[in-house]
């Protein structure tokens, strides 16, 4: 360290011009400090170069004396390089490669020969050769706006242009690089301009990197510096130049074969490769790979496919990739600077986030611009709409406003904007004066005022070296040097930018997750046993045992099974089935007898047991009864309807037999279709289909002939034929908690509320066999509801629903009962006529004895079927269908009870008995009107159905207003209502019949009113059946 530098370090003026302000950094061969040019009034960077220890042996005064001018040296140098290349090719350069020291000496001589004599004359002999070589290169470059200018050099000092923004590396590390597309393009364009300029000069940098790119001013003016490794050779054999991460692939011997290693590389192509890496640093702040050879996997991926850059930089836009296509190519011949510039001009965005960053600060900048003073009014000679051009005589430098610069520090932004506003205001309102302007050094700080500092100089206070501390400088961020005794900082000492490895953390995550080995397949998948049993094996045939348990057949060693258990708890008359099989009872019909070999009639029995502590479990225990309780209002299939079986098995024992078809009941031969349907249905084992509840199969008689296990005794109590040919009904009910059975006799009127459901009488002959093993049964669908007081009518004789005798004696065993029966038979035989339908509410409930029907009765092809839907309802009372007040109709369910006759509109209720429903194809059955009804005298074949409900005002409108003790009824004429058929038929019938007068006098409701509702119901049913067919 010389005495001059000691004085300069302590605050003295160097060379009578430069005064030190502060230290900036330490280089590999000197110190860099910030100084003030007292002559030019500007800030400069002073680089002090000291001599290395091993340079003395190659340097001496004798070398300077033998130096020639620059032109001669260049010629000699070229000749020397050619000679050396020729000798290397012929193998005569063994003496030059004898030792590394000798090789280094030859290189030193070659570099020293390149330095011009003017540079050597102004520099000291004690400085290093690299400094002299760099000064010589910069003197050849000249001045350019994007190259750091060499202002002065003398002795061991080099004076260079000061760039207040620091280098690009520090800006990238501080995330101070602007992210707008226009700003990035401005930076990249300046770098390309500088490289293109020096390449046109025949100079190649060979060490382009962010550390060698400086930032000058607030407008992000780029300055390229550090020309120590630059060369003027178009091609070179020296491959050990540059920074590792920015070196092109051809600079690494491992990427070359033996032949390629002997060939020189193009120095211009090396700069283009480094430019592409720097562009990625500016945009993404990362390097694509650490080194461009085979040791880097990222580079290997890139060498195989250039689009691998999208894997490293996922947000890179394709336009930016097009720019890099002419820079980052393995083949140097494909690198083209002109194509890079062309693609850069066509670029719209660098990343997918540019749109966000472009709109980020627009609002703030617009408000700052709006605060500027208005522009002055131009002269009258110039158009008002156009701005006035600056006169050539006025060399005033108008400041430019750059939106592209982005400071992290808000205070810096505000101070810079304030200084700009002040300068702009002074420029607008002050007259340009040439006397106050001076121009220096071909464009460096050309606009300076005598009373103000340069615009590029930061505003801060100057302090002495001994009072060094933090300054108020807000613009420059120099590297502070506080410890003088620290070791020298080498040129490549700063850590390079990082490498993005997007897959590394993902791989580590999966490796760590796998290392824990906590994954268990059973935690995420269903075990095979569960899959087979509950999912795949649900409908297999191997699951029959499971279905039997669900259908209340527990055959597992006669043990109780919770799945097949049924708990009946008395809760407001409703029964609930506990357990998960409740849904199966509701939605699935029970299996047929094909599983157990037993008849469904023996499995599905009815028992009314409301005890809280009683439970029944299939066939698990002897002597126990099986009950299947259904919710009120739910449809019960015929083969699943319950039977009345008392716990003692004394009453209502239903034999196991198949129901006969309709032809057998009526005494005729079955047709071919009926016989075929019967055989086909007998061959089928399982009727376990829930898809069709009311739909019948092929023929019209399938519901009669095809259903096995149908019995007339499904809802029929056990009948006992008395001495007077009267049938008594026995029902077993248990409504008490003590389990006592109450034997109900239909002859007693005290227990009339406990009457059981009895099917309606048939007009055909029905013979009951007292033998328990043999009986002829009819299907449930052929049964019609009757009142709870009614006996089973087994007589085939005519029935007269309208009697003038003492009807009240029917409910008691009086002595004149036989006489009344004889009178009724005679009257019915006289009124007997074919084709008359007996409504359910008009049928007799007394057994008139097993009597041979009249000769004119057709019993072989006709049967009576009830279509009444609400003959038996679930509720609190009987469904009253009003008739005459004095003469009660015995076939009306509610009129037999005098207590209920006073409650009009009440609904009938039979606890625990389901509603009989009309089958889907009921219209296909025989519904011919019989002669033994009230329409025996009529000459029409009208089919009359019973109305569903008559309550409230509707009963009054249809049946007239009831008055106590009055035998008159308000009858309407046939012409005043809608009748299904010709009106003449009904008019003649009611006009020519004398029986309707007696009926109108004896009943409140006329027959015509009965027909209105019946025909309406028939039409509705007929329309439904037509839609279903």
From Swiss-Prot:
Which residues does this entry mark as bearing Phosphoserine?
416, 419, 529, 646, 845, 884, 1014
Q: Where in the cell is it found?
A: Nucleus
Briefly state the modifications made to the protein after translation. Phosphorylated by PKA in a TORC1-dependent manner. Phosphorylation at PKA consensus sites RRxS/T decreases upon rapamycin treatment.
Domain Protein kinase positions: 18-351
Tell me which positions the record assigns to the signal sequence. Answer: none
Q: What else is known?
A: Present with 1270 molecules/cell in log phase SD medium.
Protein name as catalogued: Serine/threonine-protein kinase KSP1
Species source reads Saccharomyces cerevisiae (strain ATCC 204508 / S288c)
